[in-house]
């Protein structure tokens, strides 16, 4: 029998970032986005005719940076500030985190296309 597919959208994430290399546009400034993810699952149907138990996301065996997938999405994108590791103002953003006014996440590069 063929494989079946289902999908789930995880949304409601609010994050900000800036593209500091975009020096000639407003994208160089910190700006926010509503982020969502659409995850696809493929496999055989189980005895309930499900490809995936969406409630099982919290029990997923595959981890991202040591976290369950949904916990990782929350950690990375729920009211956070995403900063590129080569941003010349990185220390200023880290200071904001130390001061308790931002949850900073440092990644190799920023941009909606990079997530």
Identify the role of each PLM range:
Residues 1-115:
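Charge-rich, low-complexity N-terminal segments
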């Amino acid at each position: 029998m063929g494989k079946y597919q289902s999908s789930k959208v995880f949304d409601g994430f609010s994050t900000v970032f800036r593209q500091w290399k975009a020096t000639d546009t407003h994208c160089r400034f910190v700006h926010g986005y509503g982020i969502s993810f659409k995850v696809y699952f493929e496999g055989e149907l189980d005895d309930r005719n499900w490809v995936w138990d969406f409630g099982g996301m919290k029990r997923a065996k595959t981890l991202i940076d040591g976290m369950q997938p949904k916990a990782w999405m929350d950690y990375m994108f729920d009211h956070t500030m995403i900063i590129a590791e080569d941003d010349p103002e990185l220390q200023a953003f880290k200071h904001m985190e130390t001061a308790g006014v931002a949850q900073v996440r440092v990644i190799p590069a920023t941009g909606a296309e990079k997530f």
